[in-house]
Amino acid sequence: MNKRLILIGLCLMLFCRISLAQQVLSYATDVTRSLDMTKGQTTKGISKTGLPEIQINSSIRYQEIDGFGAAITGSTAYNLSLMPAEARHTFLEETFSPDKYGFSYVRVSIGCSDFSLSEYTLCDEPGIEHFGLTIEETKYVIPALKEILSINPALKIMGTPWTCPKWMKVKSLDEPVPYDSWTGGQLNPACYEDYAHYFVLWIQAMQQAGVPIYCVTPQNEPLNRGNSASLFMGWKEQQAFVKQALGPAFRKADLAVKIYAFDHNYNYDNMPDQRQYPLHIYEDADAARFFAGAAYHNYGGSPSELLLIQREAPDKELVFSEASIGTWNNGRDLEKSLLRDVEQLGLATVNGWCRGSIVWNLMLDNDRGPHRGEGACATCYGVVDIDNTDYTTITRNSHFYAMAHMSVAAKPGAYRIATNEEAVDGLAYAAFINPDGSYGLVVSNRGEAQQVNISLNGNAAFVAELPAKAVVSYSWK
């Protein structure tokens, strides 16, 4: 009798494995929220006549994928700290666990940002010997990052300064007088070595706290003089700073931390002498060798700029490092924002050769805060908003779905693979092969509900059931 039960159990296990292997797993979200990362299954290996077709070719590989995620700003970390511990861990696990939505890339500020609890750097007193982490890092940001790392140890972290210490600033390179302001100014070339050491000390301090840093950018929005905490840094300055100081400092300290250039808008803030900012930097081979690639934001211009930069510098990487939602672009209204943001921040970036995409604040409260004063964004929403009357109730906004749908289909270490050169009408999509050999596909459908054949290397893969005005992520082996 026992042998028979064991045999039946083994047969059931084998049947379940075979059944699962024959299934395509999916997550779907539509603009009405009636589908909200709703899981489904589709049978593999079938097709229907007369349907449009998405053709996938896994023999053609493009860039490797580092991941998708959001910024852990001071404001985000503060809001997380106010949540009950169990509720916070549940949210972070659902968001970052590789077995769930799998966010895997975050961005943090080096010193303050416009979403910090105060304006500060890590060395406000003149003299680099006064460097030190502040309460914003030790009480809020680092504990949040360590909790996320306990959930997803492979998390990649990008660090970016909004401003250098004020004692390192001059009004301009043409008028090199001291500049005692958080907003604007330029880095004094006499402080290049101190500022490079500032980066090294920050990376080492974070590592000592259990937070490894994957990459940095030399300056957030270097062409924006008016942000709450900012520093103007044209391409000539960034080229010189990294070539003369930052790159050599990383090598001397034996830091295997990538440096990404630029970190600003597709349209270079309409400054003619700054267009194609990274390409100018790469023209100097001694500077270019220190740069892994370039980072971009989308507050101006078109993601088609990514294709231009990749075409001219195919040996350099690209990453998308910031976008925000708010009252101006209806980020809480999925009717207006869901498909737009999936297509612009997920699909257009990876199809434009980006290795990853990071959006702005992971969590703000329902009053869009906390945030800084003059020059800061008082109208931004978080990837999610938390109700500040209970610090438990969470509302997902469009950026959450954009990053979640990409993350469940394309795991870190995946490669983007080829799809139809001519897109199917009304659809936007991207396909991937993951490190475990599974495939991922993200499809945005702007039209009515429809069926689409999916083929892989010339063979029927499955029939995709696309709800109206929805995004669906698929994964299968």
Which residue ranges define each predicted feature?
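Bacterial Sec-dependent N-terminal signal peptides
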Residues: 1-23
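N-terminal catalytic cores of secreted or lumenal carbohydrate-active enzymes
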Residues: 35-213, 234, 244
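Loop/turn elements at helix/coil->beta-strand transitions in domains of secreted/extracellular proteins
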Residues: 66-67, 99-106, 152-156, 209-215, ...
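Conserved, mostly hydrophobic/aromatic
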Residues: 70, 102, 157, 216, ...
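Active-site neighborhood of glycoside hydrolase catalytic domains
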Residues: 194-215, 222-328
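C-terminal beta-strand-rich structural cap/linker in extracellular carbohydrate-active enzymes
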Residues: 465-477
